Amino acid sequence: MYKLFRKTASSKGNVVENFTEEKNLDNLSIISDNPITLLKDDTLGRAEVSQSFAQQILSLDTRSGIVVGVLGPWGSGKTSFVNLARNEIKSAGLTILDFNPWMFSGAEQLVESFFNELSAQLKLKTELSELGKELEEYGEMFSGMAWVPFIGPWIERGRGTVKIISKVLQKRKEGVGGRRKKIEKLLRDLNKNIVIVLDDIDRLSTSEIRDIFKLVRLTANFPNIIYILAFDRVRVEEALSEQGIPGRDYLEKILQVTVDLPAVPSQVLAT
């Protein structure tokens, strides 16, 4: 049973009805648990649902950004589902960026890598290179270096370090707000959406999961940005729970659209 739920209106102002779709998994043959990328490789009958999901993504009102969750337990095929939807989204002309936080560790490395990875992918496209540069510099304002309380010992490291310090201080003077406004303008001027996919979130440590969601909240309301986050709801809710506040409450404040995938029966997974 697939459950697709949305809390926001489409770009046309119409609320899309919630729906569920049943698929019979009893007669499936043994399959590999490696993620698929092509519709022809879909043996779980998820192609149709993934295409419906992609169409909904394309209809979203993204003037203030939006965050979408693809939720399911380990082995439910979240990555494959996103890959199938990705093809439909790409064919509509949207840019898709990927960030896998599992490849990095620690709060500072996650922050730095998040902005660096996204900006690097943007710079590969001529029409997005300026946005990539601005996003990279925006990210540097949140790295540890940008908030060093003193600079004295750095002076001894030479002129290169002095230039770096001057650059950092200038960014601080300009302020996060000013840099953010530049990015928002560039995104609006693009007049098309950018999709950012974050996978394997549930493989992170508790502190890293919290850091990732802080990063998402930091940039979630950028115009024309769609986040697609794939994770195990139970694991992430557990990580986000703190001081008696349920993690589900935290998630509901972030996610505007969710799709819940059922677990794949063990008899259809390769041994």
Task: Please identify what each model-predicted range represents.
Residues 175-232, 238, 242-245:
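Conserved Walker B catalytic segment
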Residues 82-189:
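P-loop NTPase nucleotide-binding core
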Residues 255-271:
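Conserved small helical "lid"/interfacial subdomain of P-loop NTPases
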Residues 118, 243, 271:
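Conserved AAA+ ATPase "sensor/coupling" helix adjacent to the nucleotide-binding pocket
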Residues 74-75, 103-107, 232-237, 263-268:
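Conserved nucleotide-binding/hydrolysis micro-motifs of P-loop NTPases
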Residues 67-75, 97-101, 196-203, 228-231, ...:
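Extended hydrophobic secondary-structure segments that form protein cores and membrane-embedded regions
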Residues 1-104, 112, 219:
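Walker A/P-loop-proximal flanking segment of P-loop NTPase domains
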